[in-house]
Amino acid sequence: MKTGSLIAALLVSTAWVGSPLAAEPADMSRQIQAMEKQIRDMQKQLEDMKTGTQGAMEAVAREKAAREAAEKAAREAALEAGGTLVFDAGKQKVIPPANPKIVQSGTNRFTLSSADNAWTIAPTGRIHFDFGGYLNQNPEGTTGPGTVAGGKLTGGVNVRRARFGVTGRALNDFTYSLILDAGGATDATAAINTASIGYTGLRNTILEMGYFANFFVLEEASSSNDSLFIERSTPSTLASNFNAGDPRAAVGFRTWEPNYWFGAYLTSSTPNTAHALTKRTLGAYSRATYQIIETGLQSVHVGIAASHVFDVPNSGVGTARSFTMSERPELRIDPTVLLNTGPLGTLANPVTSVQIYNAESAAAFGGLFAQAEYFRTVVNRRGKTDATFDTGYGQISYTIGGRRTYTANCGCYSGVNPVTPFNPLKGDVGALEFAARVSVANLTDQFDPTVLAAAQPNFVNGGKQTNYTLGLNWYWNSIMLWKFNYIHTDFDRFNPRTAAIATPIPLGLKVDSLSGRFQVMF
């Protein structure tokens, strides 16, 4: 109670002093003195109480500060020792330090992970060792490929791919890859194959940039480890070589669910593109796919894609902006190209842009698998009509002891993982896949070999190539396999008629090839 309130209460209780019955003045003086003493006593009690409360609060604060200082010192000592100190039910407990761990996948591939799984690093690699030869070379002329003058195709061996690197995750939501390749169409020195960073913080979505394999067409979206034949088809290679091949600088995103995939990317040059060029390739592509059926054991897949090159490269100062479309007969043992348009642009008539359109389909029913794609390529040339090329392929396979399945994050199909790995002591043979493919690539446009070349200013004479391929793939386990291919190539091409030569000169070739590959991947 406050002092003012006490005085008011005492005055009220003594209000009778002013009444006719009031006491004598001496008695009243004594009563007032007694009340003043009571007030002073009560004030002293209040001050004593305030002083005691403040002291108690200060004591509690000192005790808390001392306890927190002791706990901090204990935690720091535990951290210096590599552990963590926690307090459970008033008792101290030291948790041992968390060490990195090794995580093993279902296919026995291992990853080194931090204790909290926020950081991972895993070795990755593939070795594709090819061997083969060419049989029954039947040229249609005397100067084209397969002739003494044009050069016979020769067999041999080739390390098609020898890639080694690391992949992993950083800070939970980022991925990274750094892979070098010492292989190639011919044996080569090591070069960058993949150097990329991705962000995966959004559900079923990756935002990525760097050098990496692109997803423009269905066959390119599948890893080279998972291709049905030793080489991808000529049509898909021609279509993706403009601005979406493997690997290529790109930035973009892809998103997916079990029944659809969509991606869009801005792309540029390959890792080995010369930096001296005054103009480089710059383009973009997008691809969308849909699973009409997807049950795990059965699937039906369709998709479309479009690519546009809007910045066409040249080869240096004062050179034409141009592309050349060329390709070998689906085997990389001999470097001879059959299909070859030559430069599609000149200084007077440069290539201004290129469009590629694609339709894709695939289906899997147990061990049965089929896939097909169609491509249309339009090359825009200043001062000339557009050059248009149609290409496509279809392939089918049947697997015993395994099957191909749909992979949602690439909108493509995986390779075969044998149900029972190869083990001759137990009589296990792994998995066997029997395959067939037909591909057609026609790089001839606005051309009639019976008409004078001068009368055909817009013609392109790259030839027409049809390949018939049979394949056998023998999967030992999840990381080792053999591939064997027989290819019959039918290549047609004529030199145009000239004023001096009235009859077109045939440059075609029919050739058979046998090839194999031993493949290791991890």
How should each PLM-predicted stretch be described?
Residues E36, E63, E71, E219, ...:
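Acidic-residue sensor for enzyme active/binding pockets
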